[in-house]
From Swiss-Prot:
Under oxidizing conditions two disulfide bonds are formed involving the reactive cysteines. Under reducing conditions zinc is bound to the reactive cysteines and the protein is inactive. GO terms for molecular function: protein folding chaperone; unfolded protein binding. Redox regulated molecular chaperone. Protects both thermally unfolding and oxidatively damaged proteins from irreversible aggregation. Plays an important role in the bacterial defense system toward oxidative stress. It holds the Pfam family HSP33. The keyword Thylakoid does not apply. Disulfide bonds join C225-C227, C258-C261. It is found in: Cytoplasm. Belongs to the HSP33 family. This is 33 kDa chaperonin.
């Protein structure tokens, strides 16, 4: 089965919506960029699944960023995405990390920043502390603060595959909290191995075979990095020309590497002259 897909579903007998995401190739492309320790491989998988699930709730075209920061050995873990379910991510850390490290062990006094940037309209940013035992619980707290709608998440990753499930009450005149609690209890019986090996139809049948579930068409999830030679040139142009020329004189070239995908962009003296002489970077040789 395709291992990089997201499904939305609705319960016809309750105002509750759900999502299920299963990732493999796109997850591996994120991990391939750096030699991440096992605990960060799992964290990035959970964060990637969470970002995909969050992205599927957006009602606009635009971008999303889910960023974890702190003063611990892991200074940053971030997944960026858009409404097309195109994701990329990276983490930065210092020293050795134990396989069973908690969020607090990794980030110290940490927090999560979720930034929504519509193609049209105002940007929204929400911040919650990383003071819960799991990433899923921290994302649930974000929804409690921002949308005030009961929300539940389940996130799994093992370094090879990542997956997640999402439930949320729909705005309604009626009280469906009891339905939500019932469906949450059913969903809580899911096992990571089931999400890694079963397709969406079988997962939903396994969990909700006594419920009326409407499953919508799958949405492909993919890895997509937004780096380019032009963007790298634009970054060089923001630096002092004398500083760039000093590096060029010493190294013979300027190299710009992308930590998201490992792409490497090299600029020689002619390129640098063009960058600073021309406001349009599109003329830089490829």
């Amino acid at each position: 089965m395709n291992q990089d897909i997201l499904h939305r579903y609705l319960f016809d007998n309750a105002d509750v919506r759900g999502e299920l995401v299963q990732l493999q190739e796109s997850y591996q492309q994120v991990l391939d960029a750096q030699a991440y320790p096992p605990v960060l491989q799992i964290l990035l998988g959970e964060l990637m699944a969470a970002t995909s699930l969050l992205t599927a709730t957006l009602k606009f075209s635009g971008d999303i960023s889910v960023q974890l920061q702190g003063n611990g050995p892991v200074s940053l873990a971030v997944i960026n995405g858009n409404n097309l379910q195109q994701l990329r991510g990276v983490a930065r850390w210092n020293g050795e990390l134990t396989d069973n490290a908690s969020l607090a062990d990794l980030f110290g006094q940490g927090y999560m920043v979720i930034t929504l940037t519509p193609d049209e309209g105002e940007r929204y940013q929400g911040v919650v502390a990383l003071d819960k035992p799991t990433l899923a619980a921290c994302v649930e707290e974000y929804f409690n603060q921002s949308e005030q709608l009961p929300t539940a998440l389940w996130l799994f990753a093992n370094g090879q595959q990542a997956a997640g499930m999402f439930l949320q009450i729909l705005p309604s005149q009626e009280d469906h909290h009891q339905d939500f609690e019932h469906l949450s209890q059913l969903t809580s019986t899911i096992k990571a191995e089931e999400l890694f090996t079963l397709d969406a139809e079988n997962v939903l049948h396994r969990l909700y075979h006594q419920e009326e579930v409407r499953l919508f068409d799958p949405i492909e999830v993919s890895f997509k990095c937004t780096c380019s030679r032009e963007r790298s040139a634009a970054a060089i142009k923001t630096l002092e020309q004398a500083e760039v020329e000093a590096i060029l004189a010493e190294e013979g070239k300027i190299e710009m590497g992308c930590e998201y995908c490992n792409a490497n962009y090299v600029f020689d003296g002619i390129d640098i002259t063009t960058i600073f002489a021309n406001g349009q970077n599109s003329n830089i040789p490829q």
